[in-house]
């Protein structure tokens, strides 16, 4: 899909999604610059492009996800590469100051942004960076960004995938999924919290519901229970733990399956239910607590998503958001839960650019104000 516009915005082209935990940035690097353009290009623009494309880390917390870079695509009639950068929201003032130091406001006075932080930090952009924010609706950006990324080739790879044999850990494997005909689609966006959208076409979508129990809940509870310092550390601990040490299962209550209502003995009856017993609290490890927290949050998201899919009569559920970044554990849990509890009627889908769709949607909004 090529997006063209008679009046192209001036470079540099950015889209920002300022979330409660992470800032996601999409940056378009033009590769079709003419000799005349290069001669006229000001030093500050060259400096910004070189800084962003020649580094994979910015300061101590900024990361460019090189493996997600989209090469040689066409946007607004220009050829270029699309880069994806993230950093903690708490470091946003440092980012704004960096833009000021590189004289960003001499090139652009308005930034295209979405997410709650576009409102929360609007004054900081204005007073520190001499920049104004063109604020776009985050759910609009999410849908537009998702559909755009799905429509362009991911450097010859599949953007969408699922897990085959999700119920068998030794046979479970990642498989490509063709999303050329995406509608209808249930989109479950897992960030700090969770929003669920029913998408029937590129212009026909609605927010169905959401839950406050999301990625922020997982990291917050893990920090309290285990003392972990980061999302990556929390996931590492969870990967080594056993949630059944903290959770109370159906078999712990019934001695086996609860056959009358079709509940298998391994199903969780009460998340953290074993923690009411002193002897269990004395033997549970921090890794077990991290795993139980991950399973609790993931199971809840899967349960809400399944009910929404049934109510909306949609059988394809795509999970996106930065909660799923480097979090194969939760993806496989979601894949298995949806397949098992729907008796194979629902398929859990995932996307490679999971957390960046809002930022891409903001980038696509550039011509609206340029």
UniProtKB/Swiss-Prot annotation:
Q: Which InterPro entries match?
A: ATPase_NBD (IPR043129), Type_II_PanK (IPR004567)
UniProt record similarity statement: Belongs to the type II pantothenate kinase family.
An example GO biological process term is: coenzyme A biosynthetic process
Instruction: Give the enzyme's main class according to its UniProt record, as a single word.
Output: transferase
Q: Where along the chain is the active site annotated? A: 138 (proton acceptor)
Name-wise, this protein is Pantothenate kinase 3
Q: What's the EC number here?
A: 2.7.1.33
Arranged from A to Z, the UniProt key words for this protein are:
ATP-binding, Coenzyme A biosynthesis, Cytoplasm, Kinase, Nucleotide-binding, Transferase
Q: Which residues bind acetyl-CoA?
A: 192, 195, 207
The entry's function note states: Catalyzes the phosphorylation of pantothenate to generate 4'-phosphopantothenate in the first and rate-determining step of coenzyme A (CoA) synthesis.
Give, as in the UniProt entry, the pathway in which the protein acts.
Cofactor biosynthesis; coenzyme A biosynthesis; CoA from (R)-pantothenate: step 1/5
Highest taxon listed in the record's lineage: Eukaryota
Q: What is its main location?
A: cytoplasm
Question: Organism source for this protein?
Answer: Mus musculus (Mouse)
Does the record carry Transcription as a key word? no
What does the tissue specificity note say? Answer: Highly expressed in the liver.
